[in-house]
Every structure is written in C-alpha cells, then in structure tokens.
Amino acid sequence: MKFAPYIGCWRRYGPWTACDRTMRLPQDQNVMESMKTLSIRVGLTISTGLFLILPLVYGQSPANANGAEPVPIEYSTIQYISSNDSSAAIAEKAAKVLPRPNQTAWMRLERTFFVHFGPNTFRGVEWGNGREDPSVFNPTELDADQWVRAIKESGGKMVVLVCKHHDGFNLWPTRYSNHSVATSPWRGGKGNVVREVADAARKYGVELGVYLSPADLYQLRTNPTNPNGYYGNESEKLRSVIPTDPASFKTNPSNGREPAPGFKSFTYTVDDYNRYFLNELYELLTEYGPIREVWFDGANPDPSVHEDYDYAAWYDLIRNLQPQAMIFGKGPDARWVGNESGIGRTTEWSVVPLSSSPDTFRWPDMTAQDIGSLSKLTAGSYLWWYPAETNVPILHGWFWAPRKPTRSAAELIDIYYQSVGRNGNWLLNLSPDTRGLIPDNQLAQLRLMAQVVDETFAKNLAVGGKLTADNSNKANSASLALDGNLDTWWEAAPGQRTAMLTLKLPKAATFDVVSLQEAVDHRGQRIESFSIDAWDGSKWNKMDEQTTVGHKRLLRWNSPVTTDQVRIRITGSRLEPTLAEMGLFKQAELVQPPVISERDINGSVTIDSAKGLPVVYTLDGTVPTPRSTVYRSAIAIPRGGEVYAACVAPDGRLGMVASKYFAGLAPIGWKVVSADSQEANSPASYAIDGNPNTIWQTRLTADLALPHQLTVDMGSPHRIAGFTYLPRQDGSHNGVVENYRFETSVHGHDWITNVDSGRFGNIQNNSELQEVPFAPVSARFFRFTALKELGTNGWTSAAEISVLPAESEAGR
C-alpha cells in the first residue's frame, strides 16, 4: 500500500480538519511484529484515485490477543482483517465500513436508466463485430428529448448512455476514430448523440452517465476493415500526454493537444490502445458537463486477441476529471449484481471482502449468492463498500429489434421491488428503434409501472404514528426513524444487538408494503435478520421475516393487513442496529393482469383471468383497449407473435397488461430425424416440444466431444428467415451453446449452410431467447450443430429450437 501524509483527516460532510487517528498496521504487510500502535496524521492514497477515510483499522478489538490495551475501531471507508482479529472484531469492522460520498449520492438515486442505441439497432443484433459500415447508422427522427423526458416522467434520476458498444462505433464525433457518427449519413455527418442526450439531461434535471466499452472490435488488430487497429497490436508503452494531438498519436504521443476549457492535461505511459481509450474517456468527461457514472462492461466478444487494460490510468483520469463519478463494473465503486434480470439477492450486503488492497484488486464479477456474510470475511481481507447495481432491459434484449417483446408493467413492478427493494440501484434499459424514438409499446409499460410505484409510495401511512423502542442510544431516539430524513436515525443502546420497535398508529391503517432503511451513510450496514409483526387486537402475528436491510428493504405482501400497531423485531445485527426511516404503504389499486399460457405443441395459447373478469387482447403488438377483441377460447398462433392481454373491471377500467412473445413456428408435426447424443430422461424431442421447461441434454458421462448435432423434419416445406434457440431456463449453464452452425435442406440431403460459425453474444449473462436472422430460404429440414458450450464438459442442451418464418410465411 502507498501511504502519503496529510495534515488532517476527512470529515464526511465538511472541510478538512486537523485530527489524530489511531492505526495498527497489518502484521503480514512486511511490518515488524513488534511494531506498536501508531498515532499519526495520515491519509491513504491508492492508484484508483480515491481518498479513503482513515484510520485503516488493524489489530483486535475489543480485547487484543496478547493482552494489550484494546484498539478502538473507527468508522472508515476501508477496514483490514488481521489474523488475530476475533469474530466480534470482524463483525464490528464490517459494521463500521462507510460508503464514500459519491456512493451515498448514487444509492439515493435508486431508479436510473440505460439507453442502448447504435448500429446494432439497425442490424438487429446484440453484439456487433466492428466491421459495420457507418452508413447503416441513419435514424430518421432521433429525439433525445423524448428519451430523457420519458425517463424523467418515469421517476428516473439518471440516464446512462451507451456512447460506444463493443463494435467500437462512437455516438459522438471523436477525434481518435473514423468509426463514428461523423462518418455516417445521419445529420450529414455533423450529428452528436452524446451532445443531444447531455443537453436533454440538463434540461430535465436528470444526471448523466456514460458507458464506454473497454472491448472495441473495430480497433481489433485482426479486423480487416481496420488493419491498423490498436487493440492487441502489441505496441510499445510510451509516455503519452492526454489529450493527445491526433496528428502525432502514433509518432509522438508526448505531444498533447489543447486541453478542454477548465481542465488540464495528464501524462501516462501506455500502449496504443490504452492511449486511444484514455483520449476517448477524456472527451466524454470534459465536453458534456458533470458525469455521475462511468460504466465499464466486462464483456469481451473476442478473447482470442489479448489486450491489457490499464485500469489504474483510467481510474486516475476519471478521479481527476469527474471526482464525483461512480465507476461501475470493472471499477471500485459499484458492482454488477450478477444477472441481467434486474433481481437482487434476498440477502444483499454492500460490504464485501477484497482479497487484496483496492490498489491492486482487479474487480471481478461477484456472482455468488453469498458474497458478504461473516463467513466470507476472513483474515487478510480488506472490507470495502461495494453496492450492487441491478440492470435489466425493458425488451428481451438490450438493442431494439422488430420482434423483441416488451416486458409488461406488472413484470417491471416486480423487478422494482426485487432491485430497489433489495438494497440495489435499478438500471432499466430503454431501446430506441431505427427512427431514433422509444416506441410506444415501451413507453406504455414504462409509464404504467411508474404510475403504480409513484402512487403506492405517495403516502407513508406510518407518519403520524408514535414509534418507540425497547432500547435506544440517548442521542438517537426511535422518533428519528419517522422524520423523513435519511441523515438522522434511531440507534440501539450501546452493546445491544437486538431491538424491538413498536409503531402505534392513531387509527387502524391498511397496508401491504413495508419499507425499512438503515443509516448506512453514517453507521454502515448492520442488520442481519428481522421480523415484522402486526397486532390483531389480542396478539401479535408474524407477517414477514427477512435478513438484510441496507439502503432500502421493501416487503410486499399478497394480502393487505389492517392494524393500528406494527412491530419491528431486529433479531440479529453486526453492531448496534439502526433505522433511518421506516414506512407503511398501500399498493395502488389496479386490476391485476391475466395469465397467458405457454404455446402448446399445436400452436394454441390460452388466457386465464383469476377473478373471472372479461379479458381483451391484441396480436398486432399494440396495447389493448376496452374495445379490443374479447378472449373467448384458445388463440391459434402457429407462426409466432406477441399476445397482449388485460382484464376489464366491472366499471370499465382496463387492468394491467400482460404480454408474452412466441417466437418461430409451432412444432406441429415435427419430429427428430437424428441426434448424436441424448440423455434418456432429456431426449432430443424435448427441444421441439413447445415446452420451455424441458430440455434436450446430451449424455453427461459419454459423447463428451463437441460438436453435437440435432436434425429435425418439419413435415412440410416452409419459407424461413432465421432460427431461435432458447437456452435451458433452470439457471444452469450446463451445455448452453455459445457457438453454433445452422443448416437447412429441402429433402434432407444437399444441405445449405445458413450460418457457418455463429455466436450467441452475452448468452452467459442473458438466458433469454436468442433469435438469429438469415436470408430467406425454403426448407423442410434443419440441422443445428453446437460447436462450443459455455463450459468445458463437451455437453449440449436446449430448451427449444425453432425457425423464424419469412414475411410471406408469417402472413399465410
């Protein structure tokens, strides 16, 4: 670790002040074991560019192992677990890790939005290849104002724009690449999407974040359309001034250009690609106003070409140019929750152990279910505040494509409770279409979700009640958890790890949502378990029992409860528990959506209304109205499509909309001609049975060499223009196909190769339906070949495989 002295210490919400801090150095850090407690004025600077609150706390508390006087454990943004720490000391250290100021501001945003837009939108793919012609990017009605206005009206506090995805296409006219809007026909090559989004964000008071993909396939040294690409070109590391003069980028990178107004230049010793990346970062961070988040994706679409990312230089530049910005993903400030479904863990700790100091830690994805329990906090670990961000697209995919279905408002509401309500920051992606507009089907579901959430939390039914606790710190009474201020809080009495708080309301209230928030910004995350009880007039009834709270925990019940007394029992805590706020809420009264069935093997779909209400539906992609077709019997959808349905209340109100997308032809009369391997209880026929919950699985203990093939006879010729692959939906990656070949035939011989060597980009993180278009052909037979799986076992699995009808077929 690198220590640099400072005259003073950092105060959380104020200026520097002189102070002494007690610190014990770790015994395994090349420090003499006889070294005693030092009382020094010190600050800790690491290459991430962070300034950390001190002290770093080492040693044992409350009782030192060798009988020395206990070392006080202070609040800090980092703690270190030494080999002689007791379990009590470890718990206390974890409870005294605090978020940094940029994290506090970010966590309080709660509802934030992604926007994915670029050449992929026009090509109907999730991952581009860097070989796209910039002329493909030509939106006809691009309106960034519409995007940001929709975000603002939906309760969004920040928009994170994908400024450059893996294809390397820049949505701003960068000085350092020809693969950008400047070489596209849009706005005559004079357009700048980043500028238009930044202006709209400023107009609507929405914070701005930027996504810049570390992987850049346009700059790949093996890209034939850019043979002089920087990525993986094994160039020498040279002294480079950022921003670099584009004219001398390769020949003399120490020659800088004029810095942006109000900013200065920086010098790093880096190779060509890192110099290129730093210059693009510099443009984004100096020309578009304040940046709240910098989003680094961990995906690498072509790992065959190696490039070392100089994260230390990247972080240093960000901290200097936009010190308030969060660095997400491959960075020290916020982590990916581990899925692309927007779902947080039921036990979500914001304090996590690092195996090395933040100075050298590589910030890998943390996808295990348990990443922060006390059992994970072991000797040699550094404890660090690292909150979760949950991301999910409103479509079943990140970029718009004509057939991608939209998530219903009901599903989005569920995700809200499982993201924001599970100690996470929610990042919901919107996907403008080829016009450059967010389509109505996305907006309709987004607005309904926001309406329900906003109406639900408009009134806290606990306000006006009296909150008491069976024990309290003298300075932190229970009433402070009902004052609407996250910077005041109730805290249990010293030494207490459990508590019981009772809320007595002036009159009975009916509610079905409970909100709890710890004082994480001042006291860290502590609560390990709690229960909620309701009084029925004669006894207490347990309504719910959960684990962590953190910044926010939301409990939503299927049935409301009416009572005038509520009890919160905190049954486990790492240190004296705290509550900054609590609330009781009643969900907005809306008619619940009907249930749309899966499509059966004959291509039929049924719709069920639990309360027997009439149901209306559409098949043309529009949201139903009370005048839409009334559901009376099973709907035939043999060639695929999307069903939208809603119940109609007795007063004529339309309920929440349900939707379900059915891709490809129904497997009517299909049969498996051959499969080179199959488990007896997971036969190949399960890949064409219309049931997403069954799978074809190759043998687990034999036939362990790829490729594996499945050949299907569709019974009659069809005009098709693509195929679909649904990976297994049980959460396992066993046999999930990553690389494939797809072939078709009219007679079962003389095969045509439609896709020779395709790849399902991002399938490891996104188990949604994969659609692969190709030029229309006539075929009766198709053959799917798995070339590579996500694992290394030589297996293949599939929930469903189908084909996409060509336009003429779809209209039959």
Language-model region placement:
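Short, solvent-exposed loop/turn elements at domain surfaces
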Residues: 120-126, 399-401, 475-478, 625-626, ...
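Short beta-strand segments within Ig-like beta-sandwich modules, predominantly Fibronectin type-III
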Residues: 544-548, 623-631, 761-763
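Bacterial N-terminal signal peptides
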Residues: 43-55
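Mature catalytic domains of secreted/periplasmic carbohydrate-active enzymes
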Residues: 61-483, 488-497, 503, 515-517, ...
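Short, compositionally stereotyped local motifs that mark structural "simplifiers"
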Residues: 587-709
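N-terminal secretory signal peptides that target proteins for export/translocation
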Residues: 1-40
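Aromatic, loop-rich ligand-recognition surfaces of beta-strand-rich domains
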Residues: 9-12, 441-448, 452-459, 483-592, ...
